């Protein structure tokens, strides 16, 4: 689950993944097969099996890889360059993308990525992962005005049991998955440099098929009011939380839950201001790069519909730590955030409220997962600081320290928000 507006709690339930879009331009791929759906949390739990085969496996990095490949693939289909990505897109997947208009594609933004299903097949010795991606892209037909398209697609990935995961520095780069040669050296899924067929999933995740579930020029429904669900549900605590707390203290004796909660409070307040002021750059130090970029999808969706989502007097009432986890690259901590505030949507042309209430606060709870680099230990800061010189970073220094010039990759120096899940669907 990802943010919509600031906290996604209301608008998300009216989007295509949950209810349906407007009918303009909508279609369902006739060849779309039924997939048994699981909750994202259940998929993540099942994927822990991969760590026994592949110690470098990280769900966080896999989601980054999928997002990057999605952007590359749609950009390539607009320039008739899908063959270049044959190591990562099987013929059926390329054929589906190739059926879309072959016009230049720009500003591809993934607004949501949902893990749908995971299974292993001992007969083929492969893992299979199904994800759904919701996106916005701009097509630029020659001699015509640019057109924005909203889409929902289901991508099916496969990978051999013996394959190994990428390191963080390689997660967004695409080359021969066997020898690292440029993709220009591959033809029909075979690298001409190492003479190896590389599109079988033997070396990396490969897209076996793509189902185009919806595509339209009108975006998701962003008006109306939806009541909260799940706020009164009991908190879902991970059964291994006590042991995970002990292990966290062993890895990082300086970790302090109250300081961590202070970081959550700062992220909450910063996001609220950045969203309502339409200065989303201010939230960059708070979020993973993928999550930060995804929000421009929703900003653009509101803008194109002549709407503005407003949050006022938003405040956290209580925070509960519910889960701690770690892989080779990242540590993750999930909290349940109990909050309240005003949340409404107005038409920009006249200020008329078309969703929510301008004067009625609503209480809600969400599960937030924060991550930081596994290599970063030390006191948690409520404010961002440069990892090189320690200077406090202003919002204008979100990408580069204004004191020493060091590039700032948010999760390398402290906890940042990676995922938001609604209380009625969170299962641990």
Describe the residue ranges of each PLM region.
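Intrinsically disordered, low-complexity segments
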Residues: 121-123, 133-162, 166-167, 203-243, ...
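Core segments of small alpha/beta cavity-forming domains
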Residues: 27-106, 193, 197, 212, ...
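Long C-terminal interaction/binding lobes of large macromolecular proteins
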Residues: 185, 261, 280-282, 289-293, ...
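Short metal-coordination and nucleic-acid-contact micro-motifs, chiefly zinc-binding Cys/His arrays
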Residues: 169-173, 187, 379-382, 396-397
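Alpha-helical transmembrane anchor segments and their immediate juxtamembrane flanks
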Residues: 1-17
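Surface-exposed, charged secondary-structure patches
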Residues: 101-147, 303-350
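Short, non-ligating residues that shape and space the ligands of small metal-coordination modules
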Residues: 185-186, 200-203, 395-396, 410-411
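Short cysteine-rich clusters marking metal-coordination/redox-active sites
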Residues: 176-179, 191-194, 386-389, 401-404
């Amino acid at each position: 689950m990802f943010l919509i507006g600031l906290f996604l709690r209301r608008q998300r339930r009216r989007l295509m993944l949950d209810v349906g879009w407007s009918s303009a331009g909508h279609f369902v791929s006739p060849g779309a097969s039924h997939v048994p759906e699981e909750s994202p949390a259940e998929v993540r739990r099942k994927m822990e099996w991969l760590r026994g085969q592949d110690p470098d496996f990280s769900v966080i990095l896999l989601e980054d890889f999928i997002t990057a490949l999605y952007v590359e693939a749609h950009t390539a289909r607009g320039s008739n360059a899908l063959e270049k990505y044959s190591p990562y897109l099987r013929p059926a997947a390329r054929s589906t993308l190739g059926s879309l208009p072959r016009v230049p594609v720009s500003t591809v933004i993934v607004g949501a990525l949902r893990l749908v299903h995971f299974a292993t097949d001992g007969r083929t010795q492969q893992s299979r992962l199904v994800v759904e991606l919701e996106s916005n892209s701009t097509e630029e037909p020659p001699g015509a005005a640019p057109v924005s398209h909203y889409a929902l697609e289901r991508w099916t990935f496969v990978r051999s049991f013996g394959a190994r995961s990428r390191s963080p520095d390689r997660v967004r780069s695409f080359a021969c998955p066997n020898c690292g040669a440029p993709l220009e050296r591959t033809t029909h899924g075979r690298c001409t440099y190492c003479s190896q067929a590389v599109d079988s999933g033997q070396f990396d995740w490969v897209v076996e098929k793509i189902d185009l579930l919806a595509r339209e020029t009108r975006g998701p429904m962003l008006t109306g009011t939806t009541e909260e669900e799940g706020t009164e549900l009991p908190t879902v605590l991970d059964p291994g939380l006590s042991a995970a707390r002990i292990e966290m203290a062993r890895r990082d004796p300086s970790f302090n839950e109250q300081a961590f909660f202070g970081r959550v409070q700062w992220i909450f307040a910063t996001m609220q201001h950045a969203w309502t002021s339409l200065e989303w750059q201010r939230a960059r130090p708070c979020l993973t790069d993928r999550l930060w970029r995804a929000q421009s999808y929703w900003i653009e969706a509101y803008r194109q519909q002549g709407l503005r989502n407003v949050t006022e007097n938003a405040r956290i009432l209580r925070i509960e730590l519910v889960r701690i986890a770690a892989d080779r690259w990242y540590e993750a901590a999930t909290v349940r955030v109990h909050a309240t505030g005003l949340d409404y949507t107005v038409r920009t042309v006249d200020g008329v409220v078309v969703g929510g209430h301008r004067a009625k606060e609503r209480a809600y709870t969400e599960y937030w997962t924060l991550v930081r680099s596994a290599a970063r230990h030390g006191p948690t800061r409520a404010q961002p600081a440069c990892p090189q010189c320690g200077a406090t970073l202003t919002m204008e220094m979100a990408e580069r320290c204004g004191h020493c010039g060091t590039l700032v990759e948010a999760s390398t120096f402290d906890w940042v928000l990676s995922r938001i899940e609604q209380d009625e669907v969170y299962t641990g």
